[in-house]
Amino acid sequence: MSILKKRSKEVLIYSITESKISNIFSALIIFLGSLGLLLVAISSYLGMDLFLFSEEISNFPFIPQGATMAFYGIGGLFISFYLWWILLWNIGGGFDIFDKKNKKVCFIRWGFPGKNRRIILKIPMNEIQSIRIIAGVQERGILTRTLTYESIVYMETIEQGFITLTRIEDNLTPPEIANKAGELAFFLGVPLLY
């Protein structure tokens, strides 16, 4: 996820895109793997060698191995197409708009196509109480226990409660988190709390 910032005296806009290199890489790997499984199943069904590097693929029976590979190949292609459409439609991307002129904060996110594609949350600036940095400890690792300290920037409001402004997936360093929180608190004229 990349965050682009545009700023003027009265408007601060964070543009958020959801397509990360890891998402593209995983969609590509799933597509290639499922396509390979489907080609092996077709090769088994036809009894022909569609792959130049191995003659053994066409020798195993279609039932049950080839049919199972066809099932997994088709399922993988559906998952891969779903991931590619999510990337193309930029689902989860959007804008965070802080507008002093209209005294509103808007959070706009893109959803799936349809009636409610744009998800909009509008908050009047007089409801914003503070910007908070909340640090947490997360345990990671399967075989080894690794503790990581992560900070998240929240906007505290009267009606909505705490609204997350950064996510763990943003991979922001502690100085970047502090800079973003300080910039927002200064721009909005609210206190910054730790």
Curated annotation (Swiss-Prot):
Gene Ontology cellular component annotations, sorted alphabetically: chloroplast thylakoid membrane; photosystem I
Membrane topology of the entry: Multi-pass membrane protein
Coiled-coil ranges from the UniProt annotation: none
Entry-linked InterPro entries: PSI_Ycf4_assembly
UniProt record similarity statement: Belongs to the Ycf4 family.
Gene field: ycf4
Protein localization: Plastid, Chloroplast thylakoid membrane
Organism of provenance: Phaseolus vulgaris
GO biological process, one term: photosynthesis
Major place of residence: plastid
Keywords annotated in UniProt: Chloroplast, Membrane, Photosynthesis, Plastid, Thylakoid, Transmembrane, Transmembrane helix
One Pfam match: Ycf4
Transmembrane segments: 24-44, 69-89
Protein name, per record: Photosystem I assembly protein Ycf4
Described function: Seems to be required for the assembly of the photosystem I complex.
